[in-house]
Design a protein with these regions (language model features):
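Glycine- and charge-enriched loop/helix tracts that form the active or gating conduit
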Residues: 1-113
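Short, mixed-charge aromatic SLiMs
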Residues: 22-35, 80-83, 112-133, 179-193
Length: 219
């Protein structure tokens, strides 16, 4: 809870509090937290859209592996920064994407925390068919139909609809994050980045060209 509040309100955890947490860890009390409690805190983190900061704080406190051993090392850094008002279910799916090629860890994570079956099923389907879902509009009929079969589309299942809706948000989130990165990089190119011999309109033209040249690195 302390980590969640620190992530939400962006405050520094006092050294005394950090020591208390380390003492609790040393005594093994963290190992006795019930899975339902961990999942409850995680759902609140989803609603607050702060799970990146949340995991980062747990890592800094050296308790991440005690509470969420499946999210090993700095794997949480791969979680895409989300958008506001994204549903809890799709927030969970964003978290699930860090288990790409590590489905066994994802299943262990879900089973240990008693993740709702609906979330687990959707996350597993997305992981198993991530590349095809990303490239869905370019799939040939055979590969599309395979997705329909796997998702139970013809049995009135919403799995395929939910997966494609999530992929839509996933792409939008990635595009937004990439745009923010590009914006920051291009802003660093200014009058100090071009020859001091240039004058007037030449300066603006040179800055523009350097920014265009930089964009080629993103292709």
């Amino acid at each position: 809870r302390i980590a969640r509040f620190a992530a939400r309100y962006a405050f520094e955890i006092a050294e005394e509090t950090k020591q208390v947490i380390l003492d609790i860890k040393k005594d093994g009390e963290l190992n006795h937290l019930v899975p339902e409690r961990l999942w409850l805190e995680l759902t609140k983190v989803f609603k607050e859209n702060t799970y990146y900061k949340f995991f980062n704080i747990l890592s800094d406190l050296d308790v991440l592996k005690n509470l969420f051993p499946e999210v090993y090392d700095q794997q949480y850094l791969l979680i895409p920064l989300s958008i506001d008002n994204l549903s809890e279910k799709y927030q969970f799916c964003l978290l699930a994407t860090i288990f790409y090629t590590y489905e066994d860890k994802f299943m262990s994570f879900c089973e240990r925390l008693k993740v709702p079956k609906e979330y687990q099923k959707l996350g597993q389907f997305i992981l198993n068919h991530f590349d095809d879902l990303i490239d869905y509009t370019n799939l040939d009929p055979i590969n599309r139909f395979t997705l329909y079969e796997k998702s139970g589309l013809l049995k009135q299942s919403n799995l395929m609809f939910d997966a494609l809706e999530f992929i839509h948000y996933y792409k939008m989130i990635n595009d937004k994050n990439e745009l923010l990165e590009i914006q920051a990089i291009l802003k660093e190119i200014n009058a100090d980045s071009v020859s001091p011999d240039l004058k007037g309109n030449e300066i603006g033209a040179a800055i523009r060209q350097k920014r265009i040249d930089k964009l080629y690195q993103f292709d």
